[in-house]
Each structure stands twice: as structure tokens, then as C-alpha cells.
Regions:
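Short, well-ordered alpha-helical packing segments
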Residues: 100, 126, 130, 159, ...
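Active-site glycine- and acidic-residue-rich loops that bind
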Residues: 116-118, 175-180, 288-289
Length: 359
């Protein structure tokens, strides 16, 4: 047996001193080790900063991650609260089971792990947390397409694999402000709750209103009569942009920020579908079992007649490495493609004799 002990970053002093920082680095100055790319706010940083603020008000809040302190934005939390921060190393199963134990004893564990790595702890989420209805806040970083992080890190499946678990509540913010709102809601909740958010920064689209978070309640961002656009997470910005483009083309779109996929705001969504009889869903994840599937099932369960319906998301396949914009273009998730679909759909003469038209 040969036991080889390695040192991350060996031979390059800046990497030896900051192994987490150099885990997945972009171009940097080789003399100083500093990144050449200007650091901007991203979802991970906003999450970490907000958690520090909440933890200062509530000493029951603890943070857990699996070897990704810096990547998940918990660097400052670890410095501020060293006795309330737990890095369990590459042991996601242990992270969730430990969180369950902490919740059982009255603490409020906030677990931050990448979407693709939550898969490793699926059994623990089901049996250690959700079966017992324990208050564990599961923050799902790198949800959706992650671009240059690569194929193994694409966070395609979290909405689908979490949505089938009883007792869990699942949210996704449209921007930084809504992430802060959802995190505050989650730490004051009582039960298993998950927040998914993407890699990188928020979209350029700015939202004028941010209603308070209410469990299972969607947000109508724009009322319309011709088509219902239901989106979740980062795709809400895309939905808003699409609605503006369609308005200039004479098509009146209603935009709904789902906010929650579980519980789903059935009342708001049903009213919208009955009004427009034309609905599309947009999500940053697999369409198999995600938001689109949930809406499709709702249409069938409620026996809504004469509805045109289309899901926009990622297909039943593994998504290769590539820039986010390129991947969205390949799979038809661009504003241009979705606008063209709605235009064609609006022009069609559809047989509306008691038919659900799923395209």
C-alpha cells in the first residue's frame, strides 16, 4: 500500500495559501495570483452576505457546506462565526444528516451545496429531513446551466428530483433582492425548504416591484390576454423581456413569476390559463419533471379545455460543456426563438373542440 499525501497548489505559493480560491480559477496574474477579471456580485456572494446579516440577529443559525466554503459564498460567515460554520469536506450525505440532527435540537441549519452534488445526498434529504419534517434550509447553488464549470456540474435535475418528495417547499428567486427575501423567509419557516439559484450574477433586467414572500404564492409581473408566460428563477427576466418584445408586435402577454414550484400557486395559474388559453413555461433545468411538467399536469388535472401549451427548458439528455449563451441557443432558450414560437402560435387557427394541444 502506497499512501501519497498531496498538497493542493503545490509549487505555486498563491495557490498553496489559497487552495479554495484556485479550485476553479479564471485567468490571473502569475506574480500576485490575483484574478484579471473584475469581481462582480453573484448569487453566491449575495447569499453569503445575507446569511451573515440574518445570523447576527439569530444565534440559532448555523451554516454547513461540503468543501466549498468560498464557492458557495460562505467565506465571511466562517470568519464571523467560526463556531457556527461547518465544512464537512466532500461528504454531502454527512452534511445533510448532520443538518437534520442540528434541526432536531433546535438549531437552524443552512446547507449550501452545488445542485449537482445534492444528488449524492438524496436519501438523506428524503429520510433524515423530509420524513421528519425538519427545519433544514437547503440552498442549491449552481442550479441550472453552469457554463464553463462543465458537464458534470450542470444543475439540471434539482427541481425534478426534489419536487416528488413530500413535505418539502421549493423556491427560486428571479434576482438578488428576491434571493434575500427568500432566505429570510426560509430561516423563519418551519420545515424542509429549498432555494435554488444559478451560477453568476443576476440578469440585466430590472424589476420595479418585489412583493413579500408568501408560501405557495406566485407573482404576476404583467397582466395580459393573449398568452401566459410562466417562468421561475433566472428565467423570469427572460420572460419579462419576451413580453416587452411581444407587446411591440401587438401580442399581449401575461408574465407570472412562479416563485414556488412546490407548493404551486394553482389558483393564480389556472385563472391565467383560462383567460389566455395559451401558455408557455420557461425554466433553467430539465423539462422532465420540472416546472413545465407540473403545469402540464395541472392543465390535465383541472380538465382545462382548448389550451395551447409549450415547455421551454432542457431536454432529456446530459448537457455538454459550453458558455451559457451558447447552450441556451442550442436548445432554443433564447428570447428570439421563444418570441418566434409565440408569433407562429398566435397566427395558427387552432381546432378548439375540447382539445388540449401540447406542442
Amino acid at each position: 500500500l502506497i499512501h501519497v499525501i498531496t498538497k493542493k497548489g503545490k509549487g505555486y505559493e498563491p495557490a498553496e495559501k489559497n487552495p479554495d480560491k484556485f479550485h476553479a480559477t479564471s485567468a490571473f496574474n502569475k506574480e500576485t495570483g490575483k484574478s484579471l477579471k473584475e469581481k462582480k456580485d453573484d448569487y453566491s456572494k449575495i447569499f453569503g452576505d445575507e446569511l451573515v446579516k440574518l445570523a447576527k440577529k439569530n444565534d440559532k443559525i448555523v451554516a454547513i457546506t461540503a468543501a466549498m466554503r468560498d464557492g458557495t459564498g460562505l467565506t465571511n460567515f466562517a470568519k464571523e462565526f467560526p463556531n457556527r460554520f461547518f465544512d464537512v469536506a466532500i461528504a454531502e450525505q454527512h452534511a445533510l444528516t448532520m443538518a437534520a440532527g442540528m434541526a432536531k435540537e433546535g438549531l437552524i441549519p443552512v446547507v449550501s451545496i452545488y445542485s449537482s452534488f445534492y444528488q449524492r445526498a438524496y436519501d438523506q434529504i428524503i429520510y433524515d429531513i423530509c420524513t421528519q419534517k425538519l427545519h433544514v434550509v437547503m440552498c442549491i447553488d449552481r442550479a441550472g446551466v453552469v457554463g464553463n464549470d462543465g458537464e458534470t456540474h450542470q444543475g439540471m435535475f434539482d427541481l425534478a428530483f426534489l419536487n416528488i418528495i413530500p413535505n418539502i417547499t421549493i423556491m427560486a428567486p428571479k434576482d438578488f433582492i428576491e434571493l434575500r427575501q427568500m432566505l429570510e423567509f426560509a430561516v423563519n419557516y418551519n420545515g424542509p425548504i429549498a432555494i435554488r439559484y444559478p451560477r453568476g450574477g443576476e440578469e440585466k433586467t430590472k424589476f420595479l416591484t418585489h412583493k413579500s414572500i408568501e408560501k405557495g404564492k406566485a407573482e404576476i409581473l404583467k397582466e395580459g390576454a393573449d398568452v401566459s408566460i410562466i417562468a421561475i428563477g433566472k428565467m423570469v427576466a427572460k420572460a419579462q423581456n419576451i413580453a416587452e418584445i411581444l407587446e411591440n408586435k401587438g401580442i399581449d402577454a401575461e408574465v407570472i413569476n412562479a416563485r414556488f414550484i412546490k407548493p404551486l400557486d394553482k389558483e393564480t395559474i389556472i385563472k391565467s390559463i383560462e383567460k389566455t388559453e395559451n401558455v408557455i413555461t420557461i425554466e433553467d433545468g430539465t423539462i422532465e419533471g420540472g416546472l413545465g411538467t407540473v403545469i402540464e399536469e395541472l392543465i390535465l388535472e383541472e380538465n382545462l379545455k382548448n389550451v395551447k401549451f409549450k415547455k421551454f427548458g432542457y431536454p432529456d439528455r446530459f448537457i455538454k460543456h459550453g458558455k451559457t449563451e451558447e447552450i441556451e441557443d442550442i436548445f432554443g432558450l433564447t428570447e428570439k426563438n421563444i418570441v418566434e414560437y409565440v408569433e407562429k402560435c398566435n397566427e395558427k387557427v387552432v381546432d378548439r373542440v375540447n382539445a388540449l394541444v401540447i406542442q
